[in-house]
Amino acid sequence: MAAVRGLRVSVKAGGGAEPEPMEVEEGEVEAAADRASPREVVSGSNRRYENRAGTFITGIDVTSKEAIEKKEQRAKRFHFRAEVSDQQRNVVLDREMIRKAIPKVRLETLYVYGVDDMSTEDIFAFFKQYPPGYIEWLDDSSCNVVWLDEVTPSRALLNLSSMPTNEKGQRKKDGEHSSARSKKDRLDDSPLSSGDETEEGEVEEDNPSEAEDEDETETEKKSVNPPDTLSEAEQASLLKNELRPSSKPVKGNSLYMRFATKDDKKELGAARRSQYYMKYGNPNYGGMKGILSNSWKRRYHSRRLQRDVIKKSTFIGDDVEITPTYKHLHSGLVNVPEEPIEEEEEEEEEEEDMDEDDRVVVEYRDELQAFKREREGARRSAASNSDSDEMDYDLELKMISTPSPKKSMKMTMYADEVESQLKTIRNSMRSDSVGNSVKSRIGSKSHAEKPADVRLILEEKRQSTASRQQSSSGKSDVRQRLGKRPHSPEIRKTLSIAPTSRREPLSDVHSRLGLPKQLEGKGLYSDSKEKKTGSLWNRLGTAPKDKERPSEKSEKSPAAPEEEDSVLQQAWGALIKEKEQIRQKKSRLDNLPSLQIEISRESSSGSDTDS
């Protein structure tokens, strides 16, 4: 397809059909002219239509003062008086000033407007006095006329056009005055002794005396014709780059021209909107008139591509004496007539813009399949004939000249397909094994198990602690009231049984034990039988009321099962405080004198049963 994109189309001006006024499609560029010039390098999107009649370049600025003086001197030496034309004016333009006044100006190009129903040859005929190099068509109504120098366009602009309508009368007056003055000056002889200079074709005078007399008479007249000057209004109009109407109409059209700029370019899609092609025919598509559908354009490009390939194949076949027997990719279009095809009845698809690839090469699915089968058959035949040393030129030509399809299928072997299937199976098995290993490491819970509510768990703990407190409060343990000694065997047990029991600070041990005052002076260690026979509760006394409060709280706790979680936190805080208090009590009891209270286990067990 890359080879097709670079295809160039050249249309001859004298091919029977009228030359087209502009580019057909974007992306197609005509072959460059033989006489290449740096000034011909313009925008690549504009197509050039050269002047087949030829152009002319003087090489000098004929409007300069030096050129005018030399021209007058030659006319004087040869006694030649040229006919003065009123339309021709020798005006000197300051091109540097024009470049500064008009941005992006192209002094070698004139922009011409109003060329409707005019062909390329008609425009060249209008400028035949100043033959241009080529034309760049912009649309049906305008074009750019390009010269190969910067002097000729300015002369053509001034001599073939006039001032705008509002200043046309003033320009005519100035023109008449300047032309009359030029006529008068041209009749005078030159006083300069320029006869010493000799040029080719010059003839020396036989009578020098007569020549001297003529020189003396010439000194009294002015022979040098000064260049014409523009009026201020006309000069201002040129600097503004206003459209100047042509001096004479062409085919009933009034042309307007000015200096072209770099912004005067062909718009995209102008060929599809061209009314000239619809009326006079499109030479780039066989001279077809009317609206051309996209399908017709595709078939035309395919047929043209087929002809080019056949020409190349016949050229190679003549050299190697081998006649090509294969068919091209678009072989289904062989029977299409070379004459213009009639328009098909289609919907408004011709109004839609075509992509660049669709304009050049269009692929057909049926032909693509046939092309693939044809290639496979050619490869098999080439493999069968591989034992011969001769080259298969037919196959080589076919491979080179046939464009590759836009979307070519990737050829794979059966082993590659099997390997890809095995890879997919391995990847799927690997993903399953990885998932199972992760589950085994983490450990997954059974679906039957449901996460229990945290509130229910806290409620169960609260009820269990309440039941324990209630059971422990029923037994008023003597050891809790007496205080805990380091040598007591059941210290840890009592701590776990009654965690919420609070004790009175051990300020007075005797008052807690309930000893009589008369025994205080005798000492604590008396062997009297009255102490042993007395009731344990009489000697110990009753427990204070403060110690019974925890039991009441423990009884009320199960009655309020709907308390918040803060109650459990308070219980834990109380337990920590109790541990701290127990530690302090131990330290205090250790500092006091040792109390040897002999209490038998039987009496303690009996007291428990009595309570």
UniProtKB/Swiss-Prot annotation:
Residues 423-439 have a biased composition (Polar residues). One of its GO terms (molecular function) is mRNA binding. Residues 20-31, 196-218, 339-358 have a biased composition (Acidic residues). Residues 464-475, 602-611 have a biased composition (Low complexity). It is found in: Nucleus; Cytoplasm. InterPro entries: NCBP3. Pfam families: NCBP3. Coiled coil: none annotated. One of its GO terms (cellular component) is cytoplasm. Residues 168-179, 446-463, 501-511, 544-556 have a biased composition (Basic and acidic residues). It comes from the Eukaryota. Keywords: Cytoplasm, mRNA capping, mRNA processing, mRNA transport, Nucleus, RNA-binding, Transport. A motif (WLDD motif) lies at residues 137-140. GO terms for biological process: 7-methylguanosine mRNA capping; mRNA transport. Residues 108-169 are annotated as: RNA recognition motif (RRM) domain. Residues 1-44, 159-230, 338-360, 373-393, 423-568, 583-611 are annotated as: Disordered. Belongs to the NCBP3 family. Component of an alternative cap-binding complex (CBC) composed of NCBP1/CBP80 and NCBP3. Associates with NCBP1/CBP80 to form an alternative cap-binding complex (CBC) which plays a key role in mRNA export. NCBP3 serves as adapter protein linking the capped RNAs (m7GpppG-capped RNA) to NCBP1/CBP80. Unlike the conventional CBC with NCBP2 which binds both small nuclear RNA (snRNA) and messenger (mRNA) and is involved in their export from the nucleus, the alternative CBC with NCBP3 does not bind snRNA and associates only with mRNA thereby playing a role in only mRNA export. This is Nuclear cap-binding protein subunit 3. It comes from Xenopus tropicalis (Western clawed frog).
